[in-house]
């Protein structure tokens, strides 16, 4: 089964570095890194705003919890927004591709 993870990063370089690490560790099959977005948020009871870089990571569902834990460890934010879910539907070729992710770790 295919799983996706959404996570914003402080900048492009950080997203690329962490994405490369997760690829090398065979935890993900792909990271799509977007352009800058404007974020408005509440943190520690105060309103804030800033620029972030969104990323969508693709993995196999059996690795979802491991990817989230590793991403949280690598991420520079104190409490990064990491949202993961199992896909209800995907192309069969996508399932086959991501089924091979992490196979050498098992």
List PLM regions with ranges:
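Positively charged, small/polar-rich N-terminal and surface patches that mediate targeting and assembly
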Residues: 1-106
